[in-house]
Curated annotation (Swiss-Prot):
PANTHER family: 4-HYDROXY-TETRAHYDRODIPICOLINATE REDUCTASE 1, CHLOROPLASTIC-RELATED, DIHYDRODIPICOLINATE REDUCTASE. The active site is at H156 (proton donor/acceptor), K160 (proton donor). Catalyzes the conversion of 4-hydroxy-tetrahydrodipicolinate (HTPA) to tetrahydrodipicolinate. Belongs to the DapB family. Pfam families: DapB_C, DapB_N. One of its GO terms (molecular function) is NAD binding. The lineage of its organism: Bacteria, Pseudomonadati, Pseudomonadota, Betaproteobacteria, Neisseriales. GO terms for biological process: diaminopimelate biosynthetic process; lysine biosynthetic process via diaminopimelate. It is an enzyme of class 1 (oxidoreductase). This is 4-hydroxy-tetrahydrodipicolinate reductase. GO terms for cellular component: cytosol. Keywords: Amino-acid biosynthesis, Cytoplasm, Diaminopimelate biosynthesis, Lysine biosynthesis, NAD, NADP, Oxidoreductase. It comes from Laribacter hongkongensis (strain HLHK9). It comes from the Bacteria.
Length: 267
């Protein structure tokens, strides 16, 4: 079986560098392309330069040329860039791994639509530990059920542009679904001033942006007399990058939209 040919979008960013490291150290996959904006100083340089590696792949801004020799594209950029890459992947019938967060409903619909033609793994978090945490949260919510106040606290580095994180929102969805609630109507995002007593049917979110925090998430279930806290802390972006490469290998030639629960056999 030939190696899986992967293209990395946003290769000069924090996740892009981690993805290149993951691809170049994983048997059975090869780096087939590395994409950046046309104005990036990395264009024309070896994609491994920021890592002190020699990959033999030059950074390019030519999406069509990169996809012409690819099996899948891995994208952890921003919604507007992801949707442009999505359109290109549809044209070239190239599968896509999407770790970008912050999509509106229209963006999510575009991804679902593309899943009718190509294979897509779209997930808010590619960490194995986080996806196990989703299962633990489902169990906790069903067992604790009513009478517990639920709060989700997340922390990320100062450069993250969306809040709450996609992972925090997914955690909220998992808990809300387990309780038979709609997160859109029960979520409370931040509190300020005189808010009155807590509505027992709500799920609260608190966001921290500071320093170089890779990603911390805690879901708190609290009732008079006890608290249950389920926490995941990431210390390296390689955790997410390795998960994304694993997802690409699992996806193979499949068509349709999947997430990491499918990849890990947790669904």
């Amino acid at each position: 079986m030939s190696d899986l040919r992967l293209v990395i979008a946003g290769c000069g960013g924090r996740m892009g560098r981690a993805l290149i490291e993951a691809v170049t150290s994983t048997p059975g996959v090869v780096l087939a392309g590395a994409l950046e904006r046309a104005e990036s100083p990395l264009v024309g340089q070896d994609a491994g330069l920021p890592l002190g590696l020699t990959t033999g792949v030059r950074v390019s801004h030519d999406v069509d040329a990169a996809l012409a020799r690819a099996d899948a594209l891995i994208d952890f950029t921003r919604p507007e860039a992801t949707l442009a890459y999505l359109a290109a992947c549809r044209r070239h019938k190239v599968n896509m791994i999407i770790g970008t967060t912050g999509f509106d409903d229209a963006g999510k619909a575009a991804i679902r639509d593309a899943g009718q033609e190509i294979g897509i793994v779209f997930a808010p978090n590619f960490s194995v530990g986080v996806n196990l945490t989703f299962k633990l949260l489902d169990l906790a919510a069903r067992v604790l059920n009513e009478g517990y106040d639920i709060e989700i606290i997340e922390a990320h580095h100062r450069h993250k542009v969306d809040a709450p994180s996609g992972t925090a929102l997914r955690m909220g969805e998992v808990v809300a679904d387990a309780l038979g609630r709609d997160l859109k109507t029960c979520a409370v995002y931040g509190r300020e001033g005189v808010t009155g007593e807590r509505d027992p049917g709500t799920i609260g979110f608190a966001t921290v942006r500071a320093g170089d925090v890779v990603g911390d998430h805690t879901v708190l279930f609290a009732t008079p007399g006890e608290r249950v806290e389920i926490t995941h802390k990431a210390s390296s972006r390689l955790t997410f990058a390795n998960g994304a490469v694993r997802a690409a290998r699992w996806l193979g030639k499949r068509h349709g939209q999947f997430d990491m629960q499918d990849v890990l056999g947790l669904r």
